[in-house]
């Protein structure tokens, strides 16, 4: 894309891509990283999110350095962690994992942390961590089983996707909604603008959206 620096999203998440597009930013490439997202023993939620976002950015940078067309691009990575207290919930891929997450979240408060890592064209690293507090309604067993049947939870931190059916489970939310979806837009665009990325460049092309 001519007229602005190139930008790479270090993620294969359709949700993060859609959020970046929502802000009028279309990445020139996607570089999802194959990173082991298992929390370390005793690792706190904030530390886990920061570590994984940095690891994804590191992996994307190595890929970009080998690509003549992308070398010197901005790189954005993110990692989202859902936690009850200090307990980190998994990115559920199995029915049992998702069921356990939903039973734990039922009628309770939890926190969603997303760490963003920005790599500048000069390969400096900038990072932000965003926290949102969420409270779910008390879920019946019928709620849980029907939601499991939807398949919407698969691969999602904490076993739910707030932008879908699970949005109806939320009694209260304090903080950024887009953070819970997977990419806090205010903090992401502020980080980019602070490093000289022209965040308004694509706005004129979104009139028909």
UniProtKB/Swiss-Prot annotation:
GO biological process, one term: nucleotide metabolic process
Localization of this protein: Cytoplasm
UniProt site positions, description: Important for substrate specificity: 15, 80, 163
Disulfide bonds: none
Entry's family note: Belongs to the Maf family. YhdE subfamily.
Official protein name in the record: dTTP/UTP pyrophosphatase
Record's catalysed reaction(s): dTTP + H2O = dTMP + diphosphate + H(+); UTP + H2O = UMP + diphosphate + H(+)
EC number: 3.6.1.9
One GO CC term on file: cytoplasm
Cofactors demanded by this protein: a divalent metal cation
Keyword entries, A-Z: Cytoplasm, Hydrolase, Nucleotide metabolism
Protein origin, superkingdom: Bacteria
Presence of the UniProt keyword Cytoplasm in the record: yes
Function, in words: Nucleoside triphosphate pyrophosphatase that hydrolyzes dTTP and UTP. May have a dual role in cell division arrest and in preventing the incorporation of modified nucleotides into cellular nucleic acids.
Pfam families given in the database record: Maf (PF02545)
Top EC category: hydrolase
């Amino acid at each position: 894309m001519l007229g602005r620096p190139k930008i790479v999203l270090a993620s294969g998440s359709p949700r993060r891509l859609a959020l970046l597009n929502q802000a009028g930013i279309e990445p020139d490439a996607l570089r999802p990283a194959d990173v082991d997202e298992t929390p370390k023993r005793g690792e706190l939620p904030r530390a886990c999110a920061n570590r994984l976002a940095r690891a994804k950015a590191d992996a994307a940078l190595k890929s970009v350095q080998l690509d003549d067309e992308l070398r010197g691009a901005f790189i954005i990575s993110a990692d989202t962690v859902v936690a009850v207290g200090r307990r980190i919930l998994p990115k559920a891929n199995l029915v049992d994992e998702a069921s356990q997450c939903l039973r734990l979240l039922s009628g309770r408060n939890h926190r969603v942390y997303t760490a963003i890592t920005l790599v500048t064209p000069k390969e400096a690293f900038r990072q932000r961590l965003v926290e949102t507090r969420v409270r779910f309604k008390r879920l019946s067993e019928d709620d849980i089983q029907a939601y499991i049947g939807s398949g919407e939870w698969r691969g999602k931190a904490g076993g739910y996707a707030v932008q879908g059916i699970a949005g109806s489970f939320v009694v209260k939310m304090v903080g950024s909604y887009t953070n819970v979806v997977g990419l806090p837009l205010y903090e992401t665009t502020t980080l980019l603008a602070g490093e000289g990325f022209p965040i308004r460049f694509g706005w004129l092309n979104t009139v028909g959206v």
